[in-house]
Amino acid sequence: ANKLTILMALMFDKYVAPQDIPTTGITQITKEKIEEARANNCTIKLIAHAKKLENGEVEYEVKPMNMDNSHPLASINKEFNAVFVKGNAVDDVMFYGKGAGPLPTGSAVLGDVIDIAKNVMK
């Protein structure tokens, strides 16, 4: 939720406090849900999702989601994080890097997102 707060502020000029983002953790993922995902060629990933709607509102949430194994986010593992962007000015773009653990941060990935956002808004 913390990273999503930062990304939404940058991309949509909208601040939402992390505690106000609907969040579902991974504790509800059962063995059966994992097996069902595998049977459907999917991987369960904890996804922070935000989307600007046609009416200007922004919908957002953090929750486990089934990602088709062909989707680039399905291959992100361990301490790595990724930001997958769909935009009008760019096709699908993914930024990837270490973003968890005591030393690595998502600053490099975030820096790339900021640079692209600045160029898209020119």
Task: Name these PLM-found stretches.
Residues 1-75, 80-82:
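Substrate-binding/catalytic subdomain of NAD(P)-dependent oxidoreductase enzymes
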